[in-house]
Swiss-Prot record:
EC number assigned by the record: 2.1.2.11
Sequence positions that bind 3-methyl-2-oxobutanoate: 43-44, 82, 112
Active-site annotation: 181
Organism of provenance: Bacillus cereus (strain ATCC 14579 / DSM 31 / CCUG 7414 / JCM 2152 / NBRC 15305 / NCIMB 9373 / NCTC 2599 / NRRL B-3711)
The keyword Cytoplasm is assigned to this record: yes
InterPro entries assigned to the protein according to its UniProt record, in alphabetical order: Pantoate_hydroxy_MeTrfase, Pyrv/PenolPyrv_kinase-like_dom, Pyrv_kinase-like_dom_sf
Any single biological process term in GO: pantothenate biosynthetic process
UniProt protein name: 3-methyl-2-oxobutanoate hydroxymethyltransferase
One Gene Ontology term of the molecular function aspect: magnesium ion binding
Catalysed reactions, as listed in the record: 3-methyl-2-oxobutanoate + (6R)-5,10-methylene-5,6,7,8-tetrahydrofolate + H2O = 2-dehydropantoate + (6S)-5,6,7,8-tetrahydrofolate
Amino acid sequence: MKTKTDFLKMKEQGEPITMLTAYDYPSAKLAEEAEVDMILVGDSLGMVVLGYDSTVPVTVEDMIHHTKAVRRGAKETFIVTDMPFMSYHVSLQETMVNARRIVQESGAHALKVEGAGEVISTIQYLTNAGIPVVAHLGLTPQSVGVLGGYKVQGKDAESAKKLIEDAKKCEEAGAIALVLECVPMQLAELISEQLTIPTIGIGAGQKVDGQVLVYHDLISYGVNRVPKFVKQYTSVQEEIVRGISQYVTEVKTRQFPEEKHSFTMKEEECLSLYGGKQ
């Protein structure tokens, strides 16, 4: 399994880091078989798997439950788990309780938190306690209401400079990596050059140290539309619908199950069951 040290070496050597979300045992198992470097159990599971309109309703219990499943499916892959909405915008003591629960109960190797400002002290607090933290700047979905929707961040010089400052503060606080979401590629490149920790981009262009995508977006599974920054490498959705539709048809027309899908009794047992009459 790759570790924080390996990711730093990959950045130094110019080897891109691959990260993919996973929310359950089978998706994690497939991600590990495909040799993904990191798995992110994102609170995006609230929208992708649980059907919420945002990530806000996701709880600490949800993150623990799903991370445990992912851990069972990917025993040899570095796993990062999101701290959900409001689980770290409380006192540092309460934050530690939530962080400890996620790490101890789920087996996550690192936690991800969004934003800067007061979150910088949270990163430092968790790091000092021995919990690796991945920072997340740019478009931060938990704060989408404050940001005015799902919009590109850092498009003007002033806000870009603020993001650069925040990125440096995250590194100084002890973050082991930084996710940059929906920022101009020029800004992402500049931040990547000024940090020693790896940057993982999602909608941040090519000049970052790694990329992350949502599992379901990548394979077109259960999604109606995807953001501009997503490339769909395959489409399993059409095949799944086709297979289920065929199942429905065959049941309705009594083509399924066939004899080969059924179990039988020995002839003498049948005779006994039916009282000698068949």
